[in-house]
Each structure stands twice: as C-alpha cells, then as structure tokens.
Amino acid sequence: MKFPIKTIRRGGQITAFPKNSLEVSKLVKFSNKYKFHILPIGGETNRVDGTKPQFEKTILIDFKKMNRIEEVDTDNFIITAQSGTLLKTIQKAANNKKLLFPVNIAPSDKCTIGGNISTNVGGLQTLRYGNIEDHINGLEVVLSDGTILNFLNKLKKDNFGPKLWKLFCGSEGVFGIITRASLKLIPKKKYNSTYLIQTNSLNKSIRLLKFLRNKYFDNLTSFEIIFPIPSSYLFNESAHHFNLIIEIQSNIIGNYKKDLKKYFNLNEFKIDKIEHDKSKSWIWSKREELVYNQIKYNFTEKFDISLPIDKWSVFIKKVNKFVKDNKIFTPYFFGHLGDGNLHCNFKVHPNSKKNCAYLSKFIYDLTIQSEGSVAAEHGLGLKKNYLLKKYKPSENYLFIKKLKKHLDPNSRLGKNKLFQA
C-alpha cells in the first residue's frame, strides 16, 4: 500500500500535507480504495471537536502547505486563495491594496479560510457585513470520489445554473473538501471609532443598539455586549455593569461621542463612562480575554446560540430564574448583541454529567421556544452532533441526510460530524 503523497504518522492516524487540489483528490481516491476515513485539518481552532479523529484508520488532510494567495484582483475586488491560508494573511493582503476582507474573528492568526467557510463563521462585524457566505464568490471542492468541482469565478452576476458551492459553506466538510476560494473584497473605510460604554441594564443596551442601527446603519460595524460577571473579571469591578464595545466605520469624520452623550441625556441613561479610542487594540484585547477567562475560571459548559434581539430580555430572565432556583449554576454571558449571537456559558457545582445534561436541555429547549438557533457560529462538529436530529424539523433533517448519502455514499468524509451516522 503506497500513499500518493508523503505522509507522517500522528498517534494512530496518518497525516498528509497536500500542496494542491490534485493531491487532495489523489488522497481521497486512495482513501476510498483502502477504506480510510478522511478528516480535513485547518488551524484546529474549532470548539466542537470538528477536527478530532475518531477512527484509527483515518487520513488527516492537513492544509498547512496549501496556504498560497493566488491573486488579489483590484479591478473585480476578488481575492483567490488556497483553503489553508490564514484569515489574517487574507486580511493583510487585502489591506495592502487598500481594500478590506471584512470577516473578523478572534483567532484570525490561527484559523484557516477553508475552516472558516466550512463553519460559515460570523464574528465581530457580522452586524454590518454578514457571515462569510456573504463574501464568497465561488469555491473549488473535492468530492468523496475524488472529483474536483471548480466553482471559482469573478462575476457579480452569474445565473448560469444554481450556486452549488453554497452546499459546502456551513456543512463542516461532510459534503466535500474545500480546496480554494474566491472571496469578495470591499473598499476600506477611512475612519474607525471604537467606544467602550458601561450601562446598568440589558434593556438599555438593546435600546441603544436600535438607536445606533437606525442612525448609522451603513457605518455601525460592531455592537458587543459583556454581562456583569465576565465584566467583573475583565475590569476588576463589582458585578453590576454591562460593558458594550461599539465600533463605527465611515468615510467622514463624525463626532459620534457627542451624539451618544446627547442620546444618553435625552433618555436618562445612567452611563458610568464612555471611552473613545482608549487604544482600540486595548478595548478589543479585553474582548478577546473573555474566551480565556471562561477557561481560567472553569466556565466549562458553553452554549453558542442566537436569538432574535426582541427575545433576549425574556430569555435572560428565564435563565436567571433557572439559575436561582437550582443554585448549582453560575452564568457567564457575552456576545454579539448586534447580530443576536449569545455565548451563554456556565460553571456547574458540582460538575456532573447529570447536571450538565439537565442544563443543556433547559438552554436548548428555551432557545428553540424563543425562535433561536442552537448553533450560531461554532457549528456542531462531534460534540453537538445530536442536536440536528433533535431540533431540526424532521423533513429538513432527512433532506440533509439524503444529500450526505448522495454526495458521500460510503460516509468517508467527517463521519459523525453534523449528525450521527
């Protein structure tokens, strides 16, 4: 048995480092012939065990060497890159041409564009720019039989058949392996204003979001919320403030701080501070600390959900009542209020499977009752693969399974990811 490209052993698995789509295709054909499972590996920043091997007879396709930016086309505002290219590298390449690739998530220096697309990431600027699917112009993918499908193009208008590449965005690699991407760029705004605001109420935070969204719709790029308990860890203060991080981008210099103060005075807001540009990097570094603090302080049960913004207040009230009634859970909430994505995390006392299962059922049931999604931006992976069958309408779930059976009849690609095989 001779592998089509050089491989190494990592634990019980075999790891291959292809340099192009043809080598990926050869690996997939080899895997079919010798009955190996296939697992693509990007930056390994996935939080739901999406890159965790399950079977000893698995080929890990590591995309480290497929990290080339092929073209930055400033006429058509398109950047084309291999799927192992880091998100940060793509952002820098766009910036060098005074353009912007607006998808931005915390581990941008570690995550790869292929992994970002396979989970359809959102991130810190989804409020204004949407998820990564909104910035894809086309993909190249390798199917489970080794067929290479090239959907790359630079066209704004192209109705020459359905956009089949969309099947591979957000499907976590179970329908095919993304090898290259054509991505949309936009002109970079000249000015960027960042504010750290403290208030004492979730409802006031939501009202402020509505005001800013109506007044600065095209310029409001981020509206992050940090609830009192994580705020107390970040800023060494008593746990009663909500901290908001607001970012406004524009081609015109605006005195947004003056507008904010005027709004606060008219609406009798109790605002403790507004920090404008207190080092933008410092403000965003505090936001990134949230992820590390939840690990540091043992908030081990994590829920990545999204809710309609008008449902947030009632949802939080019900969760707080649940916490108060049970006395074994401590909440740690933060999220992207602007796009409805709530990171709803908990410390469990004592941490037992029974208590964690009880908590999970409550949170997920309440999310669905609130017209939300139980998987906002991290995907399902292996860790949450039971959710699709439980919470998707049965017709939708069966349709997804039919697609999987048709595109990957032997279930070689990411078996048990998204749903249990």
Where are these regions (language model features)?
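Core alpha/beta catalytic barrel or barrel-like domain that forms the active/cofactor pocket
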Residues: 42, 104-107, 331-341, 370-381, ...
